Amino acid sequence: VPVVMAGVLGIYGLIIAVIISTGINPKAKPYYLFDGYAHLSSGLACGLAGLAAGMAIGIVGDAGVRANAQQPKLFVGMILILIFAEALALYGLIVGIILSSRAGQSRAD
């Protein structure tokens, strides 16, 4: 279970990468400095949140699998803690989407 939850974090990064790459089209419109910083901040927000969530999932998953072998009643508690750790990355994805959507809004035309 922890391996699957850790794999989802990579998908969150892929989603942000696709959103950022669709916002970059220098032939259709100029790419302003604000757009670059918005895309950079959205990638960093999702990436750092994914890093923190991955570390939490790794630590909790390791301890949970070891404890589950000794006492199977701890499985539900382990899953709940893993879900809360996954929520960290989901919040980072949401913030990244919000920041990336701001990329085309500040124009000095």
Curated annotation (Swiss-Prot):
User: Which NCBIfam families does the annotation name?
Assistant: V_ATP_synt_C (TIGR01100)
- Record-linked PANTHER family: V-TYPE PROTON ATPASE PROTEOLIPID SUBUNIT
Write down the position(s) of the site called Essential for proton translocation.
86
Q: Which organism is it from?
A: Zea mays (Maize)
One GO cellular component this record assigns the protein to is: vacuolar membrane
| Protein's name in the database | V-type proton ATPase 16 kDa proteolipid subunit
Free-text function comment from the UniProt entry: Proton-conducting pore forming subunit of the membrane integral V0 complex of vacuolar ATPase. V-ATPase is responsible for acidifying a variety of intracellular compartments in eukaryotic cells.
Oligomeric form and interacting partners:
V-ATPase is a heteromultimeric enzyme composed of a peripheral catalytic V1 complex (main components: subunits A, B, C, D, E, and F) attached to an integral membrane V0 proton pore complex (main component: the proteolipid protein; which is present as a hexamer that forms the proton-conducting pore).
A molecular function (GO) term: proton-transporting ATPase activity, rotational mechanism
What is the similarity comment for this entry? Belongs to the V-ATPase proteolipid subunit family.
Checking Pfam families in the record gives: ATP-synt_C
Q: Which top-rank group of organisms is this from?
A: Eukaryota
Cytoplasmic compartment ranges equal: 62-73
Query: Which keywords does the record carry?
Result: Hydrogen ion transport, Ion transport, Membrane, Transmembrane, Transmembrane helix, Transport, Vacuole
Can you say where in the cell this protein is located? Vacuole membrane
